[in-house]
Structures are given as structure tokens and as C-alpha cells.
């Protein structure tokens, strides 16, 4: 483990030395949203899921509580790249409210299995709605990228 840490440290230093600023200005934009879903067990109960989307230069960051299934994360990354950005996704993050727990994509919810059945607090399809809201926010931020510049 010691050797693995040393090798990882060497690679981190190489990467850090290879990074260069993209210009004199740094842009930073963010949007927060709250989406309301029915719970999976009781359609009359509601859960608010709070998310945030950031655009820092050409890095797009989606922040969401709970554990989004990997298919949803891959969808975010593929569609975010269409906006000519480097997408990052962070789950288990707290913006506000309560965690939705496991968030399965529709296909995984239909197939069942670990995390796709009883662990889902929000309705089936909620994961896709969260990803779509992140993408909507990203595209809005990307169109406004030049509106805030920090030196």
C-alpha cells in the first residue's frame, strides 16, 4: 500500500505540473434547483431533492445527494460533453433537505436488484428527471459562460 501511495503521488505531481490556466479570466457560474417527487412507497408523500450545477471555465460539475446509479452518471457525462465541457459528477453531496437514497434509472428499477428495489426513496423516473435538470442548468450556464469573470 505504501508503494501504491508513492506511485499515485508521483502521478498527481506530474498532472499538477502539466495543468495550465486557460487564460487571464476564470469564469464561475452556478444554479441550484429543487425537484419534488412522490415517494416510491406512497404516492401521496413528497420528497424534495436539492441539486446544484456548477460551470467553472470548461468544467461542469453536477452535485446531487444520494447515490445515483452509474447509468445516470454516464448519461450526464455523455450529454454534458455535447456542451464542449469536461463533466464531473458528485453524489452523496448535501445542498439542502434529505437524501433520496439510492436513485436507480428506469431500466434498473424495472430489473430490480440491490439498490433498485426497496432502497429507492423517490419515484421511478426520478433519476432521469434529476439528470435532465442538471443538463438544462448546464446548457443555461454554458450560454451565459462569459457573464461573470474573476481575475
Task: Show the residue positions of the predicted features.
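Non-catalytic substrate/cofactor recognition surfaces at enzyme active-site rims
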Residues: 1-151
